[in-house]
């Protein structure tokens, strides 16, 4: 993989050409962006273009010859460790199934990729070295020539210099030139030797003289707040990540509510007393029962009772009176009410008069006093007669506690507006709704679940508000009756911002921090991206913040102070979740008027009038992205206070019409809610930031040139070290720039606050069926693919076809051609979409069967509606209850479907398309998620996953991603991982490791069919990361050495050849597993199994353990491979080949590269396995099959099933333990000591293991399983950055040692050397105070426990909390133990100032001032000084030969003393301390350099 970069312009050209190709509109699988058609495949091609040797413009636009270039990187499957034989279940033998532990899989594959990267970079380095060597030769020639000329001039001038001063001065100048040239020649010569060593294949580079090459040395990675995260920076980011602090550095106090409570009581004590008196008076009147129940409470403490005593009587008579009399009475009562209000105001204190004056009769329905222009109608005045004035006053003024309760479902009010009427009023296609809601068995009751009605109808809003006011008053009276003073004080922030206490206390700590952060943005007149991971309650944080703004009623400068509290607000969201927003607003803060600007809203008049009404009453307008674009002119006509984009990544295309429409709002208060703020590339991140903070990241062309291209190029696996470091620096700068305005918390960081259940996400690699394999291969070999590869045809059609074949071959071929008139029962296998023709559907069938028995509930996602239709037919045939929602489901019926599924536990499956069901939908009723096919955009699949694993979920969630091994879906999955790594590089960790080998066009259209002994390409790429999943097993779980029972099974297998295996024995094992059903809870193998950690122990165990498991490999008709007469398993895949004997090859394949970076040679491997020849030869005659056909499987079932029942009662109780069948033993489990709180987790884990065991045990087409989270979370820092940091640390340590040695006196002086406590020679300058013990407090050294500001940018090795406390380099700590109490000498002060400046000045400036440092004081000590001294002393005095040591001696001495993290530093220290050479015998010798002898 040579480093062949391709200009960015070619990528753009390719994208333009790709975008010009039309894409099918009938398929949701068509790969395009909603926001502007920015295709994912175009991203894929543009990213893979680096290093593939093929012009992207030739790929998409012009015809070109087939690819010619270096060989592609092929992952060697033999180097990935599969399940150890001792760890395999008995049922797995003969099935051809490989199971991987996810960590091992990921590490192993990454090791292979790293090796390939290393080899490619080595080849690239050699090319660069050759060029550099030629340049050095030119410089050498030029320098030698110049030196000769200078010598001639000196020879000519020397005789005349004694007689002429001018000539003497010229001669001195020429001599200085000669000296400079000589120095330059030394450097060039040293560089030449260095390059010669590289070109000559030397294993260790010749170290140059640092003094001579100091100017040419490349500066180490900058100082270094960046290379390794400092302690203070880590603590800072940890507080932000865990939701305890905002990015601006403010934290919410632990006991914040007490202080505001006292303030509120002091400020409004009279008003609180008034409310208490009124509530008490109302309670006494109700208790008397004297028809005074509806008497009004005047605002004054003393209320004249006469005018309101008989209020309830007219209400009873009003039902009989005529309308005119009724209206007359209402007018009289209204006048009385106003008179009482004005009369009561006379007696109020002056402090309350301005507040009371806001309570205009016109705004009674508008509880927030938001300048509503609404006047109540006469029909509503009857409702107002039942309203209590004190409740409205309570709402607007006090901060009393109100427990949120759902609105009562019964009663006359709700009967007036039935759900059927709501749906039919504002969506005409009710027939489609009924059909969508009643899909599946027992689906007729879907229409009973209603959506939350919005407040487009102001009458409804007034009624809802009055009901809420009544509930508040009733609740307050109840608390007063019980003398419950549990009212929560408001949460107060800076500048008068308050959040109602009852609302704020219900937020999690990280959500409270989010509200605080939103307020800080508000004060700065800036927008922000709330990027919390999906399911962490971003909606609630926004509602709480908006409620706080409205509740505080403060004017801010952002809108020229024209809005008191909260002004009109626009919320743009996907259509699926519009009514979800309404529900949340009505639940958390009912006073808001929330209207939906959409066809599904309750407003039936012109949309323009709704926009005007909401803007004037300062309400909340919820609309969709399409309406923002369509009604852009009408909406932008008004001044909006806040614009909030839910799922704001919809505007990720900066040139899309919807993006430009959203950016035209005239307000600085812009908020984006997105769980995936960066999905594909940095261009999308720029688009989002340009909305919330225009100009923050400059213009797009400049941003792309300065940030996007360097960061992206540095993320490729074949990037040069310069590109890697450049990408790191740019990522650090970009991260620091956007950090304050992007708040992102992950579930893993706030999991303790949420009490979220565990999530288990795995990737199932499914085998293609024979028919799928044939169709796929035929298409790959077709003319269409040839034309695509030649650039004569666009790539989209080919990719879509491949994805269809992976899902189901009938989607591509159209299915079997059937004759008319044949009965349906005979056409089952020939029907379109028959499930046994798709490998993934076979897996789904097994999953659903197991989960249905366990009582789990499932979400089944697919990209394609056609695939959903096939799955729907399958579910009907299997008699499963289900619901379905796709793009054709009407907006009006989506929320009722979601609500129904969450509430009705009898519905087993919910079928959804990934895009429709993946945005903002809350489906916590399910705890199992199946993603049937992957999407190019990783956030699309992530959104689907997060539907179930979010706040409100009580059960453990299991997510299965289905991929077909060796097909285009694996390439899509790789692309997802690369995009996620790119996102992490900017948003999370700039040191994110590189990935993504440069896939080219040819590689997309290939098919690799891994068999049982082969691993998938993904498994190979991520080997060693622990992503492979071991097969769960019920037997042979605890054996570490070969079991005794296995030895006794050997003669049995020798006595009975494979052709004579009893069918009854084969069936009995399956009968047992089926009889157990869902109650069997398999236990997974321990991930810390010594067999996995120690390859040598693994090799010693494999033979006998595999022997014991091979004896019972055939366990049932569904698991049987077709056994031929000679005892070998026949191969039904059509290739006519059989895999190698598992005892000889497969174990070696899996152990080859799992633990070593360099694979052992073939000769070593063969020699290793020669010792195992006698142990393994007895089953060499047996082979595993790669695939087996469904037809042969069904043939066996027909012959074996009649014999199952008689054997069931006889053998179902006898299970095997340690390889021996124990009479009456039903089953066994591993004994585990676990606490009571861990039992439920173990049970859930056992359920997942049981599912995996069944998947692997049956011939359901599962090839292997990987753990997705281990891939995403297990990425280590980039090795180039680690090496650079290790080199820098080593240079600092050597510099400190060199200076220290210069300060020490020789042996002839007789002065003891400084030991840290005693001695004089070489002691720090601070120890040489000889002029008194006086101490100046202004210049004394701070105690080491105090936190120094330099800790934020210290450049030592990162010290994490909970880890070993080692002294940091440049930590600001004192150099000696007693310096805190002694005076600070001037030399020591200068030393500390220079140490501080070392973090700021460039290295070249430090080198220039090096002589000053040497003359004055030492650099502060580093944590590696002791190691360096120990290394030097060992090589100088303790090795076999003084002054030098062999590599073997050094390893024996230091290998046990070093941790893995110290290896890089140790290597650099050794290279700088010694020179290396090899003896004639090939032994490596390290010899101390003269200055360290």
Curated annotation (Swiss-Prot):
Residues that bind ATP: 532-539
Biased composition (Basic residues): 1200-1210, 1327-1336
CDD domains: cc_ERCC-6_N, CSB_WHD, DEXHc_ERCC6, SF2_C_SNF
Extent of Basic and acidic residues compositional bias: 353-363, 1211-1221, 1232-1247, 1352-1376
Protein's organism: Homo sapiens
Reaction catalysed by this enzyme: ATP + H2O = ADP + phosphate + H(+)
Stated name of the protein: DNA excision repair protein ERCC-6
Cross-referenced PROSITE patterns: HELICASE_ATP_BIND_1, HELICASE_CTER
UniProt cross-references to InterPro entries, sorted A to Z: Helicase_ATP-bd, Helicase_C-like, P-loop_NTPase, SNF2-like_sf, SNF2/RAD54-like_C, SNF2_N, SNF2_RAD54_helicase_repair
Effect of residue 652 to L: In a colorectal cancer sample; somatic mutation
Ranges spanned by the short sequence motif DEAH box, renumbered to the chain: 646-649
Gene Ontology cellular component list: B-WICH complex; nucleolus; nucleoplasm; nucleus; site of DNA damage; transcription elongation factor complex
């Amino acid at each position: 993989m040579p480093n062949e970069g391709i200009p960015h312009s070619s990528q753009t050209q390719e994208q333009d050409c790709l975008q010009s190709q039309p894409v099918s509109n009938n398929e949701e699988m068509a790969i395009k962006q909603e926001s502007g058609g920015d295709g994912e495949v175009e991203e894929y091609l543009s990213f893979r273009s680096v290093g593939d040797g093929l012009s992207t413009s030739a790929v998409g636009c012009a015809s070109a010859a087939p690819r010619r270039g270096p060989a592609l990187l092929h992952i060697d499957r033999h180097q990935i460790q599969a399940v150890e034989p001792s760890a395999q279940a008995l049922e797995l033998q003969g099935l051809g199934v490989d199971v991987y532990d996810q960590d091992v899989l990921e590490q192993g594959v990454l090791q292979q990729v790293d090796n390939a990267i290393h080899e490619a970079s080595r080849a690239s380095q050699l090319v660069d070295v050759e060029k550099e060597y030629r340049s050095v030769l030119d410089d050498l020639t030029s320098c030698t020539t110049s030196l000769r000329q200078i010598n001639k001039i000196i020879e000519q001038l020397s005789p005349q210099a004694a007689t002429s001063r001018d000539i003497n001065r010229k001669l001195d100048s020429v001599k200085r030139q000669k000296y400079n040239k000589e120095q330059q020649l030394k450097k060039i010569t040293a560089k030449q030797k260095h390059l010669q060593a590289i070109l000559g294949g030397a294993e260790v580079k010749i170290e140059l003289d640092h003094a001579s090459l100091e100017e040419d040395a490349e500066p180490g990675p900058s100082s270094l707040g960046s290379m390794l995260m400092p302690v203070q920076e880590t603590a800072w980011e940890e507080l932000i990540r865990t939701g305890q602090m905002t990015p601006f550095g403010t934290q919410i106090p632990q006991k914040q509510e007490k202080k505001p409570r006292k303030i509120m009581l002091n400020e409004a004590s009279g008003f609180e007393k008034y409310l208490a008196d009124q509530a008490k008076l109302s309670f006494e009147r109700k208790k008397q029962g004297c028809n005074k129940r509806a008497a009004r409470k005047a605002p004054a403490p003393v209320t004249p009772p006469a005018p309101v005593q008989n209020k309830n009587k007219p209400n009873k008579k009003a039902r009989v009176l005529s309308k005119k009399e009724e209206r007359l009475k209402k007018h009289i009562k209204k006048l009385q009410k106003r008179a009482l209000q004005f009369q009561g105001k006379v007696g109020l204190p002056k402090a309350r008069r301005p507040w009371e004056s806001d309570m205009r009769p016109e705004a009674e329905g508008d509880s927030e006093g938001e300048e509503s222009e609404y006047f109540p109608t006469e029909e509503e005045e009857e409702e107002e007669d039942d309203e209590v004035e004190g409740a409205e006053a309570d709402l607007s003024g006090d901060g009393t506690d109100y427990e949120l309760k759902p609105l009562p479902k019964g009663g006359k009010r709700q009967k007036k507006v039935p759900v059927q009427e709501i749906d039919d009023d504002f969506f005409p296609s009710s027939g489609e709704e009924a059909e969508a809601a009643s899909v599946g068995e027992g689906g007729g009751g879907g229409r009973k679940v209603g959506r939350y009605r919005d407040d487009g109808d102001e009458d409804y809003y007034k009624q809802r508000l009055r009901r809420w006011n009544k509930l508040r008053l009733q609740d307050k009276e109840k608390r007063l009756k019980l003398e419950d003073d549990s009212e929560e004080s408001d949460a107060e922030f800076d500048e008068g911002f308050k959040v109602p206490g009852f609302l704020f206390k219900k937020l999690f700590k990280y959500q409270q921090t989010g509200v605080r952060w939103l307020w800080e943005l508000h004060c700065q007149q800036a927008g922000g991206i709330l990027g919390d991971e999906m399911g962490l309650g971003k909606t609630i944080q926004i509602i709480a913040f908006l409620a706080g703004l409205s509740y505080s009623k403060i004017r801010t400068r952002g809108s020229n102070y024209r809005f008191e509290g909260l002004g009109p607000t626009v919320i743009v969201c996907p259509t699926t979740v519009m009514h979800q927003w309404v529900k949340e607003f009505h639940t958390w803060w009912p006073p808001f008027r929330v209207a939906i600007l959409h066809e599904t809203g309750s407003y039936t008049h012109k949309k323009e009038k709704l926009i005007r009404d909401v803007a004037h009453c300062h309400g909340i307008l919820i609309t969709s992205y399409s309406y923002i674009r369509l009604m852009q002119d009408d909406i932008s006509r008004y001044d909006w206070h806040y614009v909030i984009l839910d799922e704001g990544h919809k505007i990720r295309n900066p040139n899309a019409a919807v993006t430009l429409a959203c950016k035209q709002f005239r307000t600085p208060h812009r908020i984006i809610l997105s769980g995936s703020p960066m999905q594909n590339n940095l261009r999308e991140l720029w688009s989002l930031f340009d909305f919330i903070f225009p100009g923050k990241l400059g213009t797009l062309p400049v941003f792309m040139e300065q940030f996007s291209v360097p960061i992206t190029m540095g993320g490729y696996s074949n990037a040069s070290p310069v590109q890697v470091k450049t990408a790191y620096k740019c990522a650090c700068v970009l991260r620091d720039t956007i950090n304050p305005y992007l708040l992102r918390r992950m579930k893993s960081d706030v999991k303790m606050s949420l009490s979220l259940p565990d999530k288990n996400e795995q990737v199932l690699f499914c085998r293609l069926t024979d028919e799928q394999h044939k169709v796929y291969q035929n298409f790959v070999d077709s003319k269409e693919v040839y034309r695509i590869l030649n650039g004569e045809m666009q790539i989209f059609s080919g990719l879509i076809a491949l994805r269809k074949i992976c899902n189901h071959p009938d989607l591509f071929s159209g299915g079997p051609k059937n004759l008319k008139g044949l009965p349906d029962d005979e056409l089952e296998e020939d029907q379109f979409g028959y499930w046994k023709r798709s490998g993934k559907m076979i897996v789904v069938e097994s999953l659903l069967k197991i989960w249905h028995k366990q009582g789990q509930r499932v979400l089944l996602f697919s990209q394609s509606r056609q695939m959903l239709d096939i799955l729907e037919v399958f579910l009907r045939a299997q008699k499963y209850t289900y619901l379905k929602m796709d793009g054709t489901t009407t907006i009006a019926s989506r929320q009722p479907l979601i609500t129904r599924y969450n509430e009705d536990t009898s519905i087993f499956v919910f079928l959804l398309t990934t895009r429709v069901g993946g945005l903002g939908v809350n489906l916590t009723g399910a705890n199992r998620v199946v993603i049937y096919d992957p999407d190019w955009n990783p956030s699309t699949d992530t959104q689907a996953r997060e539907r179930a694993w979010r706040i409100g979920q009580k059960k453990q969630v299991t997510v299965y991603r289905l991929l077909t091994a060796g097909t285009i879906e694996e390439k899509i999955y790789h692309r997802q991982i690369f995009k996620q790594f790119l996102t992490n590089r900017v948003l999370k960790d700039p040191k994110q490791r590189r990935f993504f080998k440069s896939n080219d066009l040819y590689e997309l259209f290939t098919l690799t069919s891994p068999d049982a002994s082969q691993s998938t390409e993904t498994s190979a790429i991520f080997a060693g990361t622990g992503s492979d999943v071991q097969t769960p097993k019920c037997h042979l779980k605890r054996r570490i050495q070969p079991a005794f029972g296995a030895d006794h099974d050997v003669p049995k297998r020798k006595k009975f050849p494979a052709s004579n295996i009893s069918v009854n024995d084969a069936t009995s094992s399956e009968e047992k597993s089926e009889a157990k059903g869902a109650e069997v809870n398999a236990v997974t193998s321990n991930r810390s199994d010594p067999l996995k950690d120690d390859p040598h122990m693994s090799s010693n165990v494999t033979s006998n353990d595999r022997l014991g498991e091979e004896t019972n490999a055939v366990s049932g008709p569904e698991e049987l491979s077709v056994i031929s007469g000679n005892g070998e398993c026949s191969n039904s895949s059509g290739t006519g080949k059989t895999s190698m004997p598992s005892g000889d090859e497969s174990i070696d394949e899996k152990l080859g590269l799992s633990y070593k970076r360099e694979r052992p040679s073939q000769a070593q491997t063969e020699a290793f396995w020669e010792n195992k020849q006698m142990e393994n030869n007895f089953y060499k005659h047996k082979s595993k099959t790669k695939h087996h056909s469904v037809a042969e499987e069904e043939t066996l079932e027909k012959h074996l099933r009649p014999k199952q029942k008689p054997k069931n009662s006889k053998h179902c109780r006898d299970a095997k333990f340690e390889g021996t069948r124990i009479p009456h033993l039903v089953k066994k489990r591993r004994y585990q000591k676990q606490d009571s709180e861990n039992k439920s987790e173990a049970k859930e884990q056992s359920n997942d293991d049981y599912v995996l065991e069944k998947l692997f045990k049956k011939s359901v087409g599962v090839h292997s399983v990987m753990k997705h989270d281990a891939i995403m979370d297990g990425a280590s820092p980039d090795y180039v950055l680690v090496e650079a940091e290790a080199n820098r640390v080593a240079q600092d340590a050597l510099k400190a040692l060199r200076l220290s040695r210069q300060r020490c006196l020789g042996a002839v002086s007789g002065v003891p050397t400084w030991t840290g406590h005693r001695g004089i020679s070489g002691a720090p300058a601070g120890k040489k105070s000889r002029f008194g013990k006086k101490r100046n407090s202004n210049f004394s050294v701070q105690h080491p426990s105090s936190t120094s500001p330099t800790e934020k940018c210290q450049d030592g090795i990162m010290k994490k909390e909970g880890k070993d406390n080692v002294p940091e380099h440049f930590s600001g700590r004192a150099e000696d133990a007693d310096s805190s109490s002694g005076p600070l000498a001037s030399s020591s002060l200068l030393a500390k100032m220079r140490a501080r400046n070392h973090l700021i000045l460039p290295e070249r400036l430090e080198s220039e001032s090096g002589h000053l440092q040497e003359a004055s004081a030492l650099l502060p000590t580093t944590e590696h000084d002791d190691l360096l001294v120990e290394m030097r002393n060992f090589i100088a005095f303790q090795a076999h030969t003084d002054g030098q040591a062999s590599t073997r001696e050094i390893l024996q001495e230091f290998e046990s003393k070093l941790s893995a993290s110290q290896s890089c530093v140790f290597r650099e220290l050794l290279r700088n301390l010694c020179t290396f050479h090899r003896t004639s015998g090939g032994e490596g010798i390290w010899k101390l350099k003269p200055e360290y002898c």
